Regions:
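Basic, flexible linker segments flanking DNA-binding modules
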Residues: 1-60, 65-68, 136-139
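RNase H-like DDE/DDD metal-dependent nuclease/strand-transfer catalytic core used by mobile genetic elements
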Residues: 20-21, 55-62, 67-77, 83-195
Length: 197
């Protein structure tokens, strides 16, 4: 019961019934060569991934938000990151990230650093309504970007590596925060974020 005619089973029978010791990898190679089994699909090679980086600062910003724990509750941390330099333009703590907050932090960062040529984000509702089924028109950020003549780019659904730079930044930030006592308030979390950046 539960045994098949795979390499491990064949190795067991050869060893126990015929006294022959052979590696499972050898049996597998022979079975594949004989066309008796299909090789398992392999992972995509790293070389097949299309890596990109903006050529200049302010060519493209990436943005995302993540959840962080407080001593008694949760908060959300919104990040704006320059794709070329990986400079954290803005890292802010909020009870909940909303469309107006996204626009406020974006316009403040633009006033401080100059606006980017394009913005890359995931498909969260605070960034785009393109998957909202046509309800409600454009959101706050989409309207602001059109008014400023800034190109908006999105990752494909279920492809978080497209926004990998900001995702990696947030992963590092969360590890750094986890090594410290949990803040009690949004203001205390913001003080920690200011110390990180």
């Amino acid at each position: 019961q539960g045994l098949d005619a795979g390499p491990a089973t064949i190795v067991w029978h050869l060893q126990h019934h015929h006294g022959i010791t052979v590696a499972a990898a050898t049996v597998r190679r022979r079975l594949v060569a004989a066309g008796l089994i299909e090789p398992e699909p392999r992972k995509r090679p790293r070389s097949s991934y299309i890596r990109f980086q903006a050529e200049l600062p302010n060519e493209m910003w990436q943005t995302d938000f993540t959840h962080c724990g407080l001593a008694h509750g949760q908060a959300e941390v919104l990040t704006w990151l320059d794709d070329h330099s990986r400079y954290a333009l803005s890292v802010t703590a909020h009870v909940r990230v909303t469309g107006p907050i996204v626009v406020d932090t974006f316009t403040q960062s633009g006033a401080d650093q100059g606006f980017p040529a394009s913005v890359l984000s995931d498909n969260a509702m605070v960034y785009t309504t393109r998957f909202a089924g046509g309800r409600g028109g454009r959101n706050h950020l989409e309207v602001a970007l059109v008014e400023l003549g800034i190109t908006q780019k999105h990752s494909r659904p279920n492809h978080p590596t497209t926004c990998g730079k900001v995702e990696r930044f947030q992963q590092t930030l969360k590890k750094w925060l986890a090594a410290r006592p949990a803040p009690d308030t949004i203001e205390a979390l913001q003080a920690l974020l200011d110390g990180f950046t």
